[in-house]
Amino acid sequence: MRAIVAESPDQLSWQEVPDAAAGPGEVLIKVAAAGVNRADVLQAAGKYPPPPGASDIIGMEVSGVVADTGGGVADWSAGQEVCALLAGGGYAEYVAVPAGQVLPVPDGVELVDAAGLPEVACTVWSNLVMVAHLGKGQVLLVHGGGSGIGSHAIQVARALGARVAVTAGSAEKLEFCRELGAEITINYRDEDFVARLREETHGADLILDIMGAAYLDRNIDALATDGQLVIIGMQGGITGELNIGKLLAKRARVIGTTLRARPVTGPNSKTEIVQAVRASVWPMIADGRVRPIIGASMPIQQAGDAHRRLVASDVTGKIVLTV
């Protein structure tokens, strides 16, 4: 089979590699498309190795058709259209994945577009609901509202009855966020998100943060009493300084989470999250409350260009690579 091989951060080539095969409890997927994530960019640069035992091929989500199943797999069969959450291996013609991380393509969603769903759906649902228990009427602040995660989080939060505030870096992205249901839109280039939240709300009950260190102190300022800051990215750095007094005064919680390194099965596992997404998010997609936001579709041979577009924030929503 062929797959993308990262010879350097700027040289991603489509090459022959050993064939993937379904082991016990696994599903082999003939890939139609792969979603692009910042973790893929970091892995290509040698800064984010895959978990032990995972494929060293880039790619953490795909859509495609079941080609084969390993021993003990009863829920999936050859020919079914599926999408899947991966620990790696997605930028390829075939990928093997634990059966519990496979999802049916949602009703009404094109097969290629479904490649942009597993990572955002699992990240958003696990953090907003399974970790932070976002509820009706609460205020959610999403940094990077025009991103794949941001655009999905807006829709899910609105479906749950929450009020949504977002930050983004252009008027076009802010308008896009409003169309998805964001109530408060803040251009981080020339507005203070802390001041806006204080003006228009009691503060954020929950912040979903991709920035990390750069926003740490201001995120605490933006929280409501008993608020929660959930950090899922480090685009603004890994080391920050925090006034513990402010944290204590607000009875705030700071939570760091990651998806890729979770175990396949058991409590708080990928399988548990995937099944929760299937039970709760897939119906939202089926009835139109949530839809995949695909900002660009490119041939997988252009993976390097896709990575550069993602780093430059030159896309709204997700990028998918077709195989």
Identify what each model region corresponds to.
Residues 168, 214-289, 322-323:
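Glycine-rich phosphate-binding loop and adjacent beta-alpha segment
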Residues 77, 115-190:
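Mid-domain Rossmann-like dinucleotide-binding core that forms the NAD(H)/NADP(H) cofactor-binding site
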